[in-house]
């Protein structure tokens, strides 16, 4: 009698396991097809010189596919030249994306003077540096949760000259 009960329990466990696997597959497929915001880096420009360092600003366009606004949890960035990280940081809670539209985010990047001077020594011939900017935009999408969209761009940044200081 115990072996018959064990068979019934095993059959029920098998059916439940099969249903759970089907449910996981269904939800994974549905979540994979959920639209997410799309982002592109439009421009990276020299902004100015302060007492703390050299300021650059990246303009990032983010398209929201939803009719409701989506909160941005944080923006993280890493600015590299060659293989060396020259600036990194995080901007907590920078605002929200407008519903069914494109939001342009301004990502300020500050390069310390010590790093800028060493870059000037390395790049004194053409007064610009080749860079790679990696940005991670973290959004809080209802039902799905927090997602991070990586955006990367490469190009050249103008180094400040003496006329930028005066």
From Swiss-Prot:
InterPro entries: Lea14-like (IPR045043), LEA_2 (IPR004864), WHy-dom (IPR013990). Belongs to the LEA type 2 family. SUPFAM superfamilies: LEA14-like. This is Desiccation-related protein At2g46140. GO terms for biological process: response to desiccation. Gene3D superfamilies: 1.20.5.170, 2.60.40.1820. GO terms for cellular component: cytosol; plasma membrane.
């Amino acid at each position: 009698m115990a072996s018959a009960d064990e068979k019934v329990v095993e059959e029920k466990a098998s059916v439940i396991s099969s249903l759970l696997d089907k449910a996981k597959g269904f939800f994974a497929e549905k979540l994979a097809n959920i639209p997410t915001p799309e982002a592109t880096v439009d421009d990276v420009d020299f902004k100015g010189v302060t007492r703390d360092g050299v300021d650059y600003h990246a303009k990032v366009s983010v398209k929201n596919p939803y009719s409701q606004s989506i909160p941005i949890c944080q923006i993280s960035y890493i600015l590299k030249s060659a293989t060396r990280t020259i600036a990194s940081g995080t901007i907590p809670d920078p605002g929200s994306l407008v519903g069914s539209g494109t939001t342009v985010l301004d990502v300020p990047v500050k390069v310390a003077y010590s790093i800028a001077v060493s870059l000037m020594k390395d790049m004194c011939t053409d007064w610009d540096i080749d860079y790679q900017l990696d940005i991670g935009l973290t959004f809080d999408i209802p039902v799905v949760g927090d997602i991070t969209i990586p955006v990367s761009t490469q190009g050249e940044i103008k180094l400040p000259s003496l006329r930028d200081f005066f």
